[in-house]
From Swiss-Prot:
The gene is uvrB. Forms a heterotetramer with UvrA during the search for lesions. Interacts with UvrC in an incision complex. Residues 609-629 are annotated as: Disordered. This is UvrABC system protein B. It comes from Mycobacterium leprae (strain TN). Keywords: ATP-binding, Cytoplasm, DNA damage, DNA excision, DNA repair, Excision nuclease, Nucleotide-binding, SOS response. ATP binds at residues 41-48.
Amino acid sequence: MRVGGRFEVISPHEPAGDQPAAIDELQRRILAGERDVVLLGATGTGKSATTAWLIERLQRPTLVMAPNKTLAAQLANELRGMLPHNAVEYFVSYYDYYQPEAYIAQTDTYIEKDSSINDDVERLRHSATSSLLSRRDVVVVASVSCIYGLGTPQSYLDRSVELAVSNEVPRDGLLRLLVDVQYTRNDLSFTRGSFRVRGDTVEIIPSYEELAVRIEFFGDEIEALYYLHPLTGEVIRQVDSLRIFPATHYVAGPERMAQAISAIEEELAERLAEFERQGKLLEAQRLRMRTNYDIEMMRQVGFCSGIENYSRHIDGRGPGTPPATLLDYFPEDFLLVIDESHVTVPQIGGMYEGDMSRKRNLVEYGFRLPSACDNRPLTWEEFADRIGQTVYLSATPGPYELSQSGGEFVEQVIRPTGLVDPKVVVKPTKGQIDDLIGEIRKRANADQRVLVTTLTKKMAEDLTDYLLEMGIRVRYLHSEVDTLRRVELLRQLRLGDYDVLVGINLLREGLDLPEVSLVAILDADKEGFLRSARSLIQTIGRAARNVSGEVHMYADTITDSMTEAIDETERRRAKQIAYNNANGIDPQPLRKKIADILDQVYREADDTDTVQVGGSGRNVSRGRRAQSEPVRSVSVGVFEGRDTAGMPRAELADLIKDLTAQMMAAASDLQFELAARFRDEIADLKKELRGMDAAGLK
């Protein structure tokens, strides 16, 4: 039963610029029953704020899809700021590292599934599903992870434990219920997903909460329910009732599990018979051993590693039927908002086949039952069947969105701040690097930042090396930098730790960098994906948040894509300038707080334990840097600027040797936790060393 709550925007600002007209028109179209609506919103016009005001008008649960974790985190924080009294949740993949199970037949190589789960993100995923099943005023900001299989909402709800003061619940019966839904008893280490018992008091940290729950019994009657701080035990608030949701999304009752095991055994027998008929005895033995082990684990503890591969049987679905996903947790009238739709829509459509090609190999060679193929992302057709009314947000809507809306769109190109689209200057390629260096120095002297986008990784590396030699504080952003490191890198750019960021295809959608006053596009006349009109407009938008923003395109000819991008930018400039003149607006620079956009989403515990490195007295800290520590962070995954904080390659290599010796010594002394910490530091430093080698840095 979902509790009704009203969406309420709390903001010091009122809709301005194009926002009032856009909100009115979006509301009108949705209330008129239009299934697909496109909002063409230029960079910096406040599309996120428009989304929040639209949600307030419509009063409907909303799923906001973003193309990656970084933009999803940015959106979630913006919406949380505007909807502070409502549930704004964050749902992305909870893997920090993920190596999927695979089999390479050509080399007879089996790759076991290996992953590292981010505990905070897993909690946020559970928080999203529990909120969706218990209230209506919910906005979930999600990546494409929301189309992957999840346990069914009915099982998740049915297996939840409802508690209320004065209810008769035997204490031991409650403990058994908690164990059945994968909570573990641990009276020593009190962590998320565990519970502890002290006489007539049971304390639980639910899988979706930061706070603990205390249940006080008087005999078999619940006497009181509290939320408390798990570390200090301080009572935060007392409640009359609450519901404890399972610790995993894959839960089933004893009857359902017994039926699932029976169905798995039946499928196993059929598949073994098929393998034996074909003379594939190795595959048959492989499948028999693995599946029987998993069945035994499910019988004994109700769970096994890789249980998601049996989700079809656990859910009671037929062969080929789609799995339950986050979409199934929403009520029927939910609104879908797809941010950066020109990227997100193709992404949704491409997930199924990539997943399926890997699983077919596992099934064919006896590593998995055929039903494992039904643990998969939705196809585009299945996704389209599950969604209702959709708002597509983009500065450059794609062909699919425009075809769905009949070519019509709602336009939002005027910025309330009065900021004008950047001036686009086309320059010849002859002497382009010298010209670029001159422009960089001019911006650096004015405490402004520069983005440079190239076509190839090699060119980006060479340019970074050259700029370093010229004494410019520069770093290079590439595809191997993981999401959280990328966020830290962008934050350092804003803080002024360096002046120039060189990239390839990473400086586009959604990057919010008000300090950037120049975007340089090298080889702008090379037609292709990275220099299409849509890509150029997105790249130009990175300079649209600065009063003196400019875009320099280095090219010898002006292509059709360049013409289209420049004309569209000029059209938007003219419209904004006319609005500013009519309303007496003097464009003001954006003053956005420089903070890690993931701070509110990832509440990582600060690990300020230090590791002494050799005799140099240098302290290297894992996790976030303590306030008192030097600025240098270990292995940010990019090339460090060659300033005094940077470490030469030879010194870095010596440091790795030093740490390796200390790791071995710690292991010999049976100090395994310390040794593990050394091991992690060494892995980070080796990654940085490889990066330096790739860049040719000494």
